[in-house]
């Protein structure tokens, strides 16, 4: 059977459509013979074209997941231009995922999850306690990636371990402001009058699989004052070998000496060093210059009647004598009497009447006065 061919007149209309058909063919061909076209679309990912417009054979294009999506581990994220101007096949490789799980101070992710970066909804991760912490059996150490791409709330399933009780310091104090759990710090001090030897603080640190204090307890040693100062002409009562804080030393003076200052001084502390509260007293003897000076005799005035040549005239002479007067002027004569005397001369004796009073004590007369008295008394003629 012979197929009828169209006649020339019938084929003419097709020639008029030839330019349009050629244009469609050219648009479908690659820009350069042997090039691949634009890379294929991948859900939730974008190709990294880096400004290229042609993709010759063996060209590799890598995709990057869009925001909030993460590459699925093990899935391809690139295509290659093959012979025949065709791209290699690629599957969807981006999916929604939680971010890296929350970092906890008390716990860390177990080994399988440390390097993982893809955590789709429903993923469960597990933690283990860090050194210095212990598991709380009643609480779960797991977290879950929720539908909102957030991790479930982490509870405190790991608790700090406790250091041993630090004990006590003799004559000192231990300050424990924050307890004795892992990471705690305690400080030491001594009572007044004692000096600290050792560390002033200690820390609760990791020691193997447990925790221990970093430093042992210090020692508080008593502070002593230097030997008390000795004093001249005195002694220390009940002297001892050592004098600690607030202990006192008492002084006493030898016989015949007087104490000047405080009888006692006591031991004090200044900048962890012992020192005495003050200087010791002094013992001073009785000075000769402190004796009462002797009383100097005052001049004594005595009225002594004198004898005149003329019996008709009478004259009384008053003389004043001084104990230390020179002999060239008068010779003092001392007489002591314990009674009061009154002498009256006889009438008609030719002498002037008078009265001589001698008081107890020392009475001094001049020689002339003494002779006159003796004549009056009839002892001399």
Curated annotation (Swiss-Prot):
SUPFAM superfamilies in the cross-refs: Complement control module/SCR domain
Swiss-Prot/TrEMBL GO biological process terms: complement activation, classical pathway; innate immune response; negative regulation of complement activation; positive regulation of CD4-positive, alpha-beta T cell activation; positive regulation of CD4-positive, alpha-beta T cell proliferation; positive regulation of cytosolic calcium ion concentration; positive regulation of T cell cytokine production; regulation of complement activation
GO molecular function: lipid binding; virus receptor activity
UniProt keyword terms in alphabetical order: Blood group antigen, Cell membrane, Complement pathway, Disease variant, Disulfide bond, Glycoprotein, GPI-anchor, Host cell receptor for virus entry, Host-virus interaction, Immunity, Innate immunity, Lipoprotein, Membrane, Receptor, Repeat, Secreted, Signal, Sushi
PTM description: The Ser/Thr-rich domain is heavily O-glycosylated.
Disulphide connectivity of cysteines: 36-81, 65-94, 98-145, 129-158, 163-204, 190-220, 225-267, 253-283
Residue spans of biased composition, Polar residues class: 287-309
Chain residues carrying a lipid of type GPI-anchor amidated serine: 353
Gene3D superfamilies: Complement Module, domain 1
Residues covered by the Sushi domain: 35-96, 96-160, 161-222, 223-285
Tissue: Expressed on the plasma membranes of all cell types that are in intimate contact with plasma complement proteins. It is also found on the surfaces of epithelial cells lining extracellular compartments, and variants of the molecule are present in body fluids and in extracellular matrix.
Residues with attached carbohydrate: 95
Propeptide segments, given as residue ranges: 354-381
Pfam families: Sushi (PF00084)
Sequence similarity: Belongs to the receptors of complement activation (RCA) family.
Domain notes: The first Sushi domain (SCR1) is not necessary for function. SCR2 and SCR4 provide the proper conformation for the active site on SCR3.
Function: This protein recognizes C4b and C3b fragments that condense with cell-surface hydroxyl or amino groups when nascent C4b and C3b are locally generated during C4 and c3 activation. Interaction of daf with cell-associated C4b and C3b polypeptides interferes with their ability to catalyze the conversion of C2 and factor B to enzymatically active C2a and Bb and thereby prevents the formation of C4b2a and C3bBb, the amplification convertases of the complement cascade. (Microbial infection) Acts as a receptor for Coxsackievirus A21, coxsackieviruses B1, B3 and B5.
Record: disease: Complement hyperactivation, angiopathic thrombosis, and protein-losing enteropathy: An autosomal recessive disease characterized by abdominal pain and diarrhea, primary intestinal lymphangiectasia, edema due to hypoproteinemia, malabsorption, and less frequently, bowel inflammation, recurrent infections, and angiopathic thromboembolic disease. Patients' T lymphocytes show increased complement activation causing surface deposition of complement and the generation of soluble C5a.
Subunit structure: Monomer (major form) and non-disulfide-linked, covalent homodimer (minor form). Interacts with ADGRE5.
Protein name: Complement decay-accelerating factor
Species in which this protein is naturally found: Homo sapiens
Gene, per the UniProt record: CD55
